[in-house]
Amino acid sequence: MFIWEKNIKMPDNLYNELIDAIRNETSYYNRYDGSSGLTSATYENTQNEYFTSFFDDSFKIEGLYEFYGEVIKEMMGQLGMWNRSRYEFELWTQRYNIGTTSHEPHDHFSGCEIISFNHIIDATEKKCFYFQDDEENKIYPGKQDSGHFFAWPPWRVHGADKVTEPNVNRLIVAGNISLSEYYDLEDKRLVCQEPEKHCYVWRCFQL
Protein backbone atom coordinates (compact mmCIF):
# COMPACT_ATOMS: atom_id res chain seq x y z
CA MET A 1 0.00 0.00 0.00
CA PHE A 2 2.98 2.29 0.56
CA ILE A 3 5.67 2.94 -2.05
CA TRP A 4 8.32 3.04 0.68
CA GLU A 5 8.39 3.08 4.47
CA LYS A 6 10.89 3.17 7.30
CA ASN A 7 10.99 4.08 10.98
CA ILE A 8 13.15 7.20 11.38
CA LYS A 9 13.70 9.19 14.55
CA MET A 10 13.89 12.94 14.13
CA PRO A 11 17.02 14.31 15.87
CA ASP A 12 16.24 15.87 19.25
CA ASN A 13 17.56 19.30 18.22
CA LEU A 14 15.25 19.44 15.19
CA TYR A 15 12.32 18.21 17.25
CA ASN A 16 12.83 20.87 19.91
CA GLU A 17 13.15 23.62 17.30
CA LEU A 18 10.00 22.39 15.59
CA ILE A 19 8.01 22.46 18.83
CA ASP A 20 9.32 25.93 19.68
CA ALA A 21 8.41 27.23 16.23
CA ILE A 22 4.86 25.94 16.52
CA ARG A 23 4.48 27.56 19.92
CA ASN A 24 6.07 30.90 19.10
CA GLU A 25 5.87 31.81 15.43
CA THR A 26 3.05 33.48 13.58
CA SER A 27 1.07 30.67 12.03
CA TYR A 28 -1.41 30.17 9.26
CA TYR A 29 -4.88 28.86 9.98
CA ASN A 30 -7.17 27.38 7.38
CA ARG A 31 -10.91 26.98 7.91
CA TYR A 32 -13.10 24.60 5.95
CA ASP A 33 -15.49 27.45 5.14
CA GLY A 34 -12.78 28.78 2.82
CA SER A 35 -11.48 31.60 5.00
CA SER A 36 -7.86 31.73 6.06
CA GLY A 37 -5.19 34.07 7.32
CA LEU A 38 -2.25 34.68 9.62
CA THR A 39 -2.63 34.67 13.38
CA SER A 40 -0.22 35.15 16.25
CA ALA A 41 -1.79 32.09 17.87
CA THR A 42 -1.04 28.51 16.89
CA TYR A 43 -3.12 25.36 16.58
CA GLU A 44 -4.68 26.24 19.94
CA ASN A 45 -6.22 29.40 18.46
CA THR A 46 -9.84 30.37 18.87
CA GLN A 47 -10.74 28.93 15.47
CA ASN A 48 -9.86 25.46 16.81
CA GLU A 49 -8.18 24.67 13.51
CA TYR A 50 -5.30 22.25 13.21
CA PHE A 51 -1.88 23.86 12.88
CA THR A 52 -0.34 23.87 9.41
CA SER A 53 2.73 25.59 8.03
CA PHE A 54 1.70 24.80 4.45
CA PHE A 55 0.85 28.40 3.52
CA ASP A 56 3.38 30.13 5.77
CA ASP A 57 6.68 30.83 3.99
CA SER A 58 8.14 32.32 7.17
CA PHE A 59 7.96 28.98 8.99
CA LYS A 60 11.53 27.71 8.69
CA ILE A 61 13.49 25.22 10.79
CA GLU A 62 17.26 25.21 10.30
CA GLY A 63 18.44 21.79 9.17
CA LEU A 64 14.98 20.38 8.43
CA TYR A 65 15.40 20.28 4.64
CA GLU A 66 18.87 18.79 4.98
CA PHE A 67 17.54 16.03 7.25
CA TYR A 68 14.72 15.09 4.90
CA GLY A 69 16.95 15.50 1.86
CA GLU A 70 19.02 12.55 3.10
CA VAL A 71 15.91 10.48 3.82
CA ILE A 72 14.54 11.19 0.35
CA LYS A 73 17.89 10.40 -1.26
CA GLU A 74 17.86 6.98 0.43
CA MET A 75 14.27 6.36 -0.64
CA MET A 76 14.83 7.43 -4.25
CA GLY A 77 17.93 5.24 -4.47
CA GLN A 78 16.07 2.19 -3.22
CA LEU A 79 13.26 2.90 -5.69
CA GLY A 80 15.75 3.10 -8.57
CA MET A 81 15.11 6.79 -9.16
CA TRP A 82 18.18 8.55 -7.73
CA ASN A 83 20.32 8.07 -10.86
CA ARG A 84 17.45 8.47 -13.33
CA SER A 85 15.80 11.71 -12.31
CA ARG A 86 16.13 15.27 -11.14
CA TYR A 87 13.66 16.31 -8.49
CA GLU A 88 12.80 18.85 -5.85
CA PHE A 89 10.73 18.51 -2.70
CA GLU A 90 8.63 20.64 -0.38
CA LEU A 91 7.84 20.19 3.31
CA TRP A 92 5.18 21.36 5.72
CA THR A 93 4.29 20.65 9.34
CA GLN A 94 0.88 19.88 10.82
CA ARG A 95 -0.28 19.34 14.36
CA TYR A 96 -3.66 18.15 15.68
CA ASN A 97 -5.24 17.44 19.04
CA ILE A 98 -8.65 16.65 20.52
CA GLY A 99 -9.59 20.35 20.48
CA THR A 100 -8.83 20.96 16.80
CA THR A 101 -10.21 19.94 13.45
CA SER A 102 -8.35 17.46 11.29
CA HIS A 103 -7.63 17.06 7.57
CA GLU A 104 -10.46 16.34 5.13
CA PRO A 105 -9.92 13.96 2.14
CA HIS A 106 -7.67 15.45 -0.53
CA ASP A 107 -4.86 14.58 -2.93
CA HIS A 108 -1.52 16.20 -3.83
CA PHE A 109 -1.32 15.72 -7.59
CA SER A 110 -1.10 18.70 -9.96
CA GLY A 111 1.00 17.28 -12.79
CA CYS A 112 4.63 16.93 -11.69
CA GLU A 113 4.47 15.28 -8.26
CA ILE A 114 5.66 11.68 -8.20
CA ILE A 115 5.68 10.83 -4.48
CA SER A 116 3.93 12.18 -1.38
CA PHE A 117 5.14 11.33 2.09
CA ASN A 118 4.27 11.65 5.75
CA HIS A 119 6.57 11.38 8.76
CA ILE A 120 4.69 10.83 12.02
CA ILE A 121 6.75 12.57 14.69
CA ASP A 122 4.30 12.19 17.60
CA ALA A 123 1.64 9.53 17.05
CA THR A 124 -1.75 8.90 18.60
CA GLU A 125 -2.71 5.47 19.92
CA LYS A 126 -5.44 5.19 17.29
CA LYS A 127 -4.55 5.34 13.59
CA CYS A 128 -5.62 8.67 12.05
CA PHE A 129 -4.20 8.58 8.50
CA TYR A 130 -6.35 6.89 5.88
CA PHE A 131 -6.74 6.43 2.15
CA GLN A 132 -10.19 6.79 0.58
CA ASP A 133 -11.59 4.77 -2.32
CA ASP A 134 -14.25 5.74 -4.87
CA GLU A 135 -17.00 4.59 -2.51
CA GLU A 136 -15.60 6.86 0.22
CA ASN A 137 -14.49 3.90 2.29
CA LYS A 138 -11.58 4.65 4.60
CA ILE A 139 -8.55 2.35 4.49
CA TYR A 140 -6.09 2.66 7.37
CA PRO A 141 -2.72 1.42 6.14
CA GLY A 142 0.35 -0.02 7.79
CA LYS A 143 2.01 1.11 10.97
CA GLN A 144 1.35 4.63 12.21
CA ASP A 145 3.70 4.77 15.17
CA SER A 146 5.94 7.67 16.18
CA GLY A 147 8.87 7.80 13.76
CA HIS A 148 7.07 6.02 10.93
CA PHE A 149 7.90 7.55 7.52
CA PHE A 150 5.78 6.38 4.60
CA ALA A 151 5.30 7.37 0.96
CA TRP A 152 2.46 6.91 -1.53
CA PRO A 153 1.35 8.06 -5.01
CA PRO A 154 0.30 11.74 -4.84
CA TRP A 155 -2.91 11.13 -6.79
CA ARG A 156 -4.28 8.90 -4.04
CA VAL A 157 -7.04 10.49 -1.95
CA HIS A 158 -6.18 10.54 1.74
CA GLY A 159 -7.02 12.35 4.97
CA ALA A 160 -6.65 12.25 8.74
CA ASP A 161 -9.33 11.55 11.32
CA LYS A 162 -9.92 13.88 14.23
CA VAL A 163 -7.79 13.11 17.27
CA THR A 164 -9.97 11.62 20.02
CA GLU A 165 -7.36 11.04 22.73
CA PRO A 166 -6.95 13.73 25.43
CA ASN A 167 -3.59 15.35 26.16
CA VAL A 168 -2.06 14.16 22.89
CA ASN A 169 -0.72 16.30 20.05
CA ARG A 170 -0.38 14.42 16.77
CA LEU A 171 2.61 15.97 14.99
CA ILE A 172 3.65 15.21 11.42
CA VAL A 173 5.95 16.50 8.70
CA ALA A 174 4.56 15.92 5.22
CA GLY A 175 5.77 16.69 1.72
CA ASN A 176 5.80 16.09 -2.01
CA ILE A 177 8.58 15.11 -4.39
CA SER A 178 8.21 16.64 -7.86
CA LEU A 179 10.14 15.51 -10.93
CA SER A 180 11.78 18.04 -13.22
CA GLU A 181 13.55 15.43 -15.39
CA TYR A 182 13.28 11.67 -15.83
CA TYR A 183 15.47 9.31 -17.85
CA ASP A 184 14.03 5.97 -18.92
CA LEU A 185 15.99 2.84 -19.87
CA GLU A 186 15.55 3.40 -23.62
CA ASP A 187 17.49 6.65 -24.02
CA LYS A 188 14.52 8.95 -23.58
CA ARG A 189 14.52 12.08 -21.44
CA LEU A 190 11.27 13.50 -20.11
CA VAL A 191 11.22 17.09 -18.89
CA CYS A 192 8.46 18.73 -16.87
CA GLN A 193 7.96 22.39 -17.81
CA GLU A 194 5.68 25.06 -16.37
CA PRO A 195 4.87 27.52 -19.20
CA GLU A 196 2.47 29.33 -16.89
CA LYS A 197 1.65 29.06 -13.21
CA HIS A 198 0.04 25.74 -12.27
CA CYS A 199 0.18 24.55 -15.88
CA TYR A 200 2.56 21.61 -16.35
CA VAL A 201 3.68 20.15 -19.67
CA TRP A 202 5.81 17.03 -20.12
CA ARG A 203 8.13 16.94 -23.14
CA CYS A 204 9.91 13.82 -24.38
CA PHE A 205 13.37 13.94 -25.99
CA GLN A 206 15.21 11.11 -27.72
CA LEU A 207 18.84 10.98 -26.54
Language model region names:
Residues M1-N83:
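Non-heme Fe(II)/2-oxoglutarate
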Residues K6-I8, Y140-Q144, F205:
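Generic detection of short hydrophobic beta-strand segments and adjacent strand-loop junctions
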Residues N30, Q193-L207:
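Short, cationic low-complexity segments
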Residues T46-N48, T93, K143, F205:
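Intrinsically disordered, low-complexity regions enriched in polar/acidic and amide residues
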Residues M81-K162, N167-N176, S180-E186:
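Catalytic core of non-heme Fe(II) oxygenases with the double-stranded beta-helix
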Residues E186-Q193:
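Long amphipathic alpha-helical segments
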